[in-house]
């Protein structure tokens, strides 16, 4: 029975690696040096498993055959199609959800403010990843090879794929940090009522976020190359991280810790710090006539702060399993341990689950906003189900100030638009 579960978790994790096959997958990130492609002894794989020397998935650094893990692996077509359905679902939900979120913010002038601009920036980063990277994942899973592997366009995709993946994560992380800082600024200046429009400082922040995210993803574009190999008598090429310089060797060696520290811990620490400061600010100013006069205004800002906090929590839940499996692999796994196969199967299964959860993060933010905030829920319903509203009176929305959208007739909206410019919208 133990052998059965060992085999099951092992091939499940291998499919997970093929699904993502990005900078986060074990097929390109388990070891220090990437210079070979191997297949597992006694297996019947419909795809190529890329491994590394001296530390590949099952073969120790001495390369002896008797040190292979004993499990046999076989991938069923049904399992591949199940994962294809999951990827397609994420693609559809992510594309529709993030595109709708961008449309809502773009079409409503009253929503063009600092916090909404950061949320739109986050959604755009997720949308780019969903539209470009996920189709490549599905193709690799079904075809069992890298797309356009024999021509220059395949090389371009090999550079673009990990670059966009890492850029998307960087955009998400830095936007969450910026939103936490923005919420603290909003509470610290609670007597100031923010108007409509994107502040210059927020525009600079967004541009800086994208530039920095692209810069930090450059090592991925440099390190990933098309590596030729022979499999079952046929010549193939696959996209792998191949460290050919001292800098890339250093990057590959510290990559797991760098990803864990910057792309996971930093937004959590930033949120913890600024939300603690925000709480202290609210407690220190809990009394006062001005606060009483602006109690509704402060309530609106607290609701927005809760929404941002929810996005950070979802990010942590989606990415924690993947980072945990990488850190455990780095610190606990010993390739020379005779009992390593049981631990390896557990880590691979955790990695597979983590990869899918991390991918889900690119489509789950619009869903979270739909359920957490009534204002977003009403906006999504209005935008996605506009045909259902055509028989009703022409309706438009006022700024998203409270926990729900207040709908006004077209004539009333003209009167309220000018007043709304002095309120703090969602935000």
UniProtKB/Swiss-Prot annotation:
GO terms for molecular function: endothelin receptor activity. The keyword Protease does not apply. Residues 103-112, 182-205, 279-306, 373-427 are cytoplasmic. Glycans are attached at residues 29, 62. It is found in: Cell membrane. Residues 21-80, 133-159, 230-256, 329-347 are extracellular. CDD domains: 7tmA_ET-AR (cd15975). The chain crosses the membrane at residues 81-102, 113-132, 160-181, 206-229, 257-278, 307-328, 348-372. Interacts with HDAC7 and KAT5. Receptor for endothelin-1. Mediates its action by association with G proteins that activate a phosphatidylinositol-calcium second messenger system. The rank order of binding affinities for ET-A is: ET1 > ET2 >> ET3. This is Endothelin-1 receptor. It comes from Bos taurus (Bovine).
């Amino acid at each position: 029975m133990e052998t059965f579960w060992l085999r099951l978790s092992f091939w499940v994790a291998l499919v997970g690696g093929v699904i993502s096959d990005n900078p986060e997958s074990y097929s390109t990130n388990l070891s220090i040096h990437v210079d070979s492609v191997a297949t597992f002894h006694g297996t019947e794989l419909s795809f190529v498993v890329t491994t590394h020397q001296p530390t590949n998935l099952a073969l120790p650094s001495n390369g002896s055959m008797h040190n292979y893990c004993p499990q046999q692996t076989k991938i069923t077509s049904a399992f591949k199609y199940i994962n294809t359905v999951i990827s397609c679902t994420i693609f559809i939900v992510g594309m529709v959800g993030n595109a709708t979120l961008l449309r809502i913010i773009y079409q409503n002038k009253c929503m063009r403010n600092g916090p909404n601009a950061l949320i739109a920036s986050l959604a755009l980063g997720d949308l780019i990843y969903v539209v470009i990277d996920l189709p490549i994942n599905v193709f690799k899973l079904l075809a069992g090879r890298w797309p356009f592997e024999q021509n220059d366009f395949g090389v371009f995709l090999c550079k673009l794929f990990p670059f966009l993946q890492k850029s998307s994560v960087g955009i998400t992380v830095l936007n969450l940090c910026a939103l936490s800082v923005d919420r603290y600024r909003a509470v610290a200046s609670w007597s100031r009522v923010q108007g409509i429009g994107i502040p210059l400082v927020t525009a600079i922040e967004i541009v800086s976020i994208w530039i920095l995210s692209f810069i930090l993803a450059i090592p991925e574009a440099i390190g990933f190359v098309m590596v030729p190999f022979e499999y079952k008598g046929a010549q193939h090429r696959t996209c792998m991280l191949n460290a050919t310089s001292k800098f890339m060797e250093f990057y590959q060696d510290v990559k797991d810790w760098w990803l864990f520290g910057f792309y996971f811990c930093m937004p959590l620490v930033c949120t913890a710090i600024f939300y603690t400061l925000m709480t202290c600010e609210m407690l220190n100013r809990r009394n006062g006539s001005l606060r009483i006069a602006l109690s509704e205004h402060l309530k609106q800002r607290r609701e927005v702060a809760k929404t941002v906090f929810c996005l950070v929590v979802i990010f942590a839940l989606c990415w924690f399993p993947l980072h945990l499996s990488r850190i455990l692999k780095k610190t606990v796994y010993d390739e020379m341990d005779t009992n390593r196969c049981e631990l390896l199967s557990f880590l691979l299964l955790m990695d597979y689950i983590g990869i899918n959860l991390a991918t889900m993060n690119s489509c789950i933010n619009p869903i979270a906003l739909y359920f957490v905030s009534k204002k977003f829920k009403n906006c999504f319903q209005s935008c996605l189900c506009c045909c259902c509203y055509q028989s009703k009176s022409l309706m438009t929305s006022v700024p998203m100030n409270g926990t729900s959208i207040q709908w006004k007739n077209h004539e009333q909206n003209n009167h309220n638009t000018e007043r709304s410019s002095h309120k703090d919208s969602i935000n």
